């Protein structure tokens, strides 16, 4: 019974466990209930070089379609950072096709206007802008920095640059009791850096 439930909304709401299909169906029900158009997309995903069947969502916001993969956000950086990640929140085709392939033809998703990072103004085109964002946030007392960098396969390098920049700042100030953790997703360009 649990195996069947994991592929539908019952698994999500009754057992708090589900496979991607159950999660995508639950997202559809919840978003449709608040008048956000949403469909379940089936296809395959590639993670660590393996292709596996997968389901995610396509939402329509202000007349623009976006890909939304709550399953992958649940399993992304949040577990190690104790936070809710938004790596796969309202993506364009250009980003989603790096790891997802739909079984059927879908509407073209070309906008990033309602992407989590665009809405929060945490998308940067250059490394120095990301560094400036981190420095300003650090001055404001923030200890966690979550942003997106444009460009192919640059997130890891930017996260490393921020990491070393923060280490230099701490070294200059004689701070020795701080640790820095960083995680980057090169596929969608997200970086999460935490000082603890």
Which residues does each PLM region occupy?
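Acidic/polar residues at beta-strand termini and the immediately following turn/coil
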Residues: 1, 69, 185-187
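Secondary-structure boundary elements
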Residues: 1-12
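Generic detector of short, locally flexible boundary/turn motifs and exposed helical patches
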Residues: 3-5, 21-25, 110-111
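N-terminal accessory/pre-domain segments preceding catalytic cores
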Residues: 11-12, 92-196
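Soluble non-cytosolic domains of exported or imported proteins
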Residues: 14-22
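Hydrophobic/aromatic-rich core segments of domains that either
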Residues: 21-94
